[in-house]
Amino acid sequence: MEASSVLLLRVSSVVDKDVDHPQFFDPPYALKYLQAGLQKYPDVTVHLLDCWVHPITVSDMLARAEGIRPDLIVISSSSFDAQVANDFVASMKQQQEAPLLIGIGQSHYLDRDVRNIHEKDYDAILLGEPEQEFFRLFDQIRARGAGDGEWREHYLRCYEQGQRFAVEEPDRLSFPSYTPEELESYRSIFPVQVPKRVVWGYLIATRGCPHGCVFCSEVMRVSIGRKMRSRSAANVADEMEHLERQGVNICSFQDDSFSADQRFVKSLCEELVARDSKMPWMARVRVDELDYELLALMKQAGCVMLGLGVESGSQRIIEQMQKQRHPKPWPDLCRQVFQWTRQLGIGTNAYYVIGNPTETREEIEQTIALALELKSDTIQVHFYTPYPGSMAWEKHKDVIAQHDATQMFHYATPMFALADVSIEDLVKLRSQFYRRYIFRASFGLTHMRKHAAFYWHNRDIFWSLLGIRKIFR
């Protein structure tokens, strides 16, 4: 089989379309890496269809596939896309000359029985990070043919055993490229102190996360495992320049924990300073992995914003989450780090979680009080959601089994209450959280002083963020 035409498909999300919280869509990172690698085959035509940014029905997906007539389709689906993906795959397999169907994505962690493969729906499913393993599979298909049993048996066995594939040599991955339309579709909604229309580019510099937060799951991560696998600083800086040539003028590192490998962060910042890089960037970091010297170097290297998981103002809840590693009490550690970022002029987005197991109303009030004290530029308040693969999922699976896990989403109204607060009151508390944070006179004045020029050039983002008012209903 030549496999000369490949369709890369991210199926439509069916849960978050009615969520009342502002959000934006990340690129389908794994598919973009596959696209970049496949484009190096001179005889292969690659098509990418992202139904997250262009939502279409299963019937429309089938029609698009019929128009392309690919030899192979890679279907990427998240936990809340599982049914859509299964419907598409089942329909494709009914065709007389069905293409090979390869499944990737977190939906396959939900219920890892082998029903789909045994019923010949998918020809193979790659758990974990498919960006390198896919090409071993692809080369076998091209060399041995679609009907070869050896590669099928191998990948069936890997799936049955729950084997997660990992990118062990990230420097060898090809750099993804983006069309102008894609760059427009994947615009982040974070306000940054950049006085021009921003064109966001996205990178994954490190893979893995050494921490063991109870709520963390591969379903919501971009990588797997605790083993850190960092790219070289030069390779990352090269990709930033690659993105800049495509029109990108600000980068976002999407690593699960950008600060986990502090030696890498230091080397990357030194590389960017040595190149006299003018590219501003942001990343998600942990408060217990930062010090003033590292933050100052990050600022010098172009860092304009950091996303920090504060999570809770209750020390008990933080310890229950298994986030506490530093001897200093968590709230005090947060106060110190946010003071440093203000001194250095680095913007901050703080993440909070309410509805934690056994959490009381008083502890949620402690979280709101800490948020008001930290004074981050923006906040995101999530509902506690035990996704598949997390320790929380295992602990509460008897409760979860009574509900449709594919419908769980951390921005959506919880399906069940694990806190000592009712679901109705949790929804009200989240609304109060945002109201009390946003409607302070000091917040409005400070925020607009810092970001007025940004909003002038990025009015679409301003209007997107105003969507938060839906929560106040």
Regions found by a protein language model. Name each.
Residues D113-I117, L294, T358-E373:
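Catalytic cores of alpha/beta
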Residues H54, R286, G313-R325, F338-E363, ...:
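Conserved strand-turn element in the central/C-terminal portion of the radical SAM core barrel
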Residues D26, P176-N349, A369:
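Radical SAM [4Fe-4S] cluster-binding motif and immediate context
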Residues E2-A237:
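Acidic, low-complexity intrinsically disordered segments
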Residues V6, V46, L101-I102, C251, ...:
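Hydrophobic/aromatic residues located in beta-strands of well-ordered beta-sheets
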Residues M1-L8, D18-D20, K40-T45, L62-D71, ...:
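Radical SAM enzyme core and accessory elements
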